[in-house]
Amino acid sequence: MPSPAPPTELLPWERAVVLLSCALSALGSGLLVATHALWPDLRSRARRLLLFLSLADLLSAASYFYGVLQDFAGTSWDCVLQGALSTFANTSSFFWTVAIALYLYLSIVRTTRGPSTDHLIWAFHLISWGVPLAITVAAVSLKKIGYDASDVSVGWCWINLEAEDRVLWMLLTGKLWEMLAYILLPLLYLLVRKHINRAHQALSEYRPICEGRQLQRGSSTSTADKKLVLIPLIFICLRVWSTVRFVLTLCGSPAVQTPVLVVLHGIGNTFQGGANCIMFVLCTRAVRTRLFSLCCCCPRPSTQSPPGAPTPPKIGESQESRRTPEVPST
């Protein structure tokens, strides 16, 4: 790797844009966590995985916010702490994103259910929290985390550019898993979509025969489950700018300091939680309706009942009785 270039200077407007992205991502991740806590009938396995991804994104956005706000000029104790937190959260986010894609593949294509799915989720926890934690502890112990001159970040601390083996540690603390995700996520996504298309074709051929229970069973892949397929696409669109700047840094190109790339990198690394919130809260009718009713303090519209009639069941109760197990809300 060539000698480190002069530090990338962050302009005030660039810092403001990235700070706004961090704040929106933290707010979005917080909303996803809140909806999971408020409405138990929406707690399917798929949304539980989304909850863990949101927790990682929330920690990531908070640590990035502090780093961009401080705009470190050298390695300090808070630089190392911020770099460690963001490294752990960011790497964990990579693992949870792949875990969601793998869950979709196994549950939709392989129709994995029951105890085997529970064991799979425990394995997701062990890998998605344990591996990033081990890598982060090793990086901190060996003093690899520190000031990076914003050439592979946007104001926050990551791998110290003065470390001789900095490329190896950049790969271990994020880039290796990011690049593997670029391969695994589209592959799993294509397999899931191929299976869904085949299922739709089969249903269209036999629709006159199987309109009852089999048709309902075929619709167990709910709209929310299909929306989870978009997570890999969002991941790639957001993260690719970070990879571009990493490659430019390896090549010693001055283009790494291009303002547009810097801003796209800053937004891409920090806005995952906001993007997930848009898709799974604001664009999900069941969640959006409840959230707006809660914010506006307005009861959900219902038909008028005569005096003395039994009170209609609450939202959670009515949907709980109709809800198919393990199918996220739409």
UniProtKB/Swiss-Prot annotation:
Annotated tissue distribution: Expressed in the primary cilia of radial glial progenitors (RGPs) in the developing neocortex.
Domain of life: Eukaryota
Pfam families, alphabetized: 7tm_2 (PF00002)
Keywords: Cell membrane, Cell projection, Developmental protein, Differentiation, G-protein coupled receptor, Membrane, Receptor, Transducer, Transmembrane, Transmembrane helix
Topological domain ranges for the Extracellular compartment: 1-15, 70-87, 141-166, 249-259
Any one Gene Ontology BP term: radial glial cell differentiation
Keyword Lyase tagged: no
Stored InterPro entries: GCR1-cAMP_receptor, GPCR_2-like_7TM, GPCR_2_secretin-like, GPCR_Rhodpsn_7TM
GO cellular component, one term: ciliary membrane
Biased composition (Basic and acidic residues): 317-330
Positions of transmembrane segments: 16-36, 49-69, 88-108, 120-140, 167-187, 228-248, 260-280
Topological domains annotated Cytoplasmic: 37-48, 109-119, 188-227, 281-330
Keyword S-adenosyl-L-methionine (UniProt): no
Membrane topology recorded in Swiss-Prot or TrEMBL: Multi-pass membrane protein
Cellular location(s): Cell projection, Cilium membrane
Major localization listed first in the record, in broad terms: membrane
Region (Disordered): 301-330
Entry's Gene Ontology molecular function annotations: G protein-coupled receptor activity
Family from the record: Belongs to the G-protein coupled receptor 2 family.
Biological function: Orphan receptor that promotes neuronal differentiation of radial glial progenitors (RGPs). The activity of this receptor is mediated by a G(q)-protein that activates a phosphatidylinositol-calcium second messenger.
Protein's name in the database: G-protein coupled receptor 157
